[in-house]
Amino acid sequence: MAAPMFSIIIPTLNVAAVLPACLDSIARQTCGDFELVLVDGGSTDETLDIANIFAPNLGERLIIHRDTDQGVYDAMNRGVDLATGTWLLFLGADDSLYEADTLARVAAFIGEHEPSDLVYGDVIMRSTNFRWGGAFDLDRLLFKRNICHQAIFYRRGLFGTIGPYNLRYRVLADWDFNIRCFSNPALVTRYMHVVVASYNEFGGLSNTIVDKEFLKRLPMSTRLGIRLVIVLVRRWPKVISRAMVMRTVISWRRRR
């Protein structure tokens, strides 16, 4: 089978209750140029049975890897190693692609916006139906919050250039990875006005566990939620914003 355009990577562990809706949203895509990489950490429920129900429909496009891992980011790194697609998307088992033509719309955007290394859109928060996203830059990543990773398509080669997810961060390694991407001036990042996923905002580890190792590396303003820095940056961007961002980026690179 020729290498697909997209690899959709889903880490799983005892997710039988939510996995069917996720897999159904993938199987019904009008764009079939994808593979599904399911990385299971040793489920003891019906997770793998459910995945195999979709095997006749997906055929060779379904890759199932089962082994113990060191957490979700270790599973995601393994998914990257297994993937053959040009572009990688990571979904939680309790998330789903938003529309049947989502991949088709993303493929069209990428085709019209070359070169690109990272393209991202928006998500719909499932509990409130709120659309979250918009365009990001390094300032927004450092001083406000992260892009929802269910909305990001990474060129696979980035994981060779930038490196894998850092396993010392238990729940926010994707934020660290995005900062590394956005702080690299050689990479091209693009925002697309497309809703990529329906996102279960209460299902992630970041809502239940504090990643102290990662948070202590963020700017003080981000950690404490102080908005004064943002006001100062907006009023005197050339004096404050660039200096603060560069100090943070230099620190990030030195401490990787």
From Swiss-Prot:
This is PGL/p-HBAD biosynthesis glycosyltransferase Rv2957. Pfam families: Glycos_transf_2. One of its GO terms (molecular function) is glycosyltransferase activity. CDD domains: GT_2_WfgS_like. Its EC number is 2.4.1.-. It comes from the Bacteria. One of its GO terms (biological process) is glycolipid biosynthetic process. Was identified as a high-confidence drug target. GO terms for cellular component: membrane. Belongs to the glycosyltransferase 2 family. Involved in glycosylation steps downstream of mono-O-methyl-glycosyl-p-hydroxybenzoic acid derivative (p-HBAD I) and 2-O-methyl-rhamnosyl-phenolphthiocerol dimycocerosate (mycoside B) during the p-hydroxybenzoic acid derivatives (p-HBAD) and glycosylated phenolphthiocerol dimycocerosates (PGL) biosynthesis. Keywords: Glycosyltransferase, Transferase.
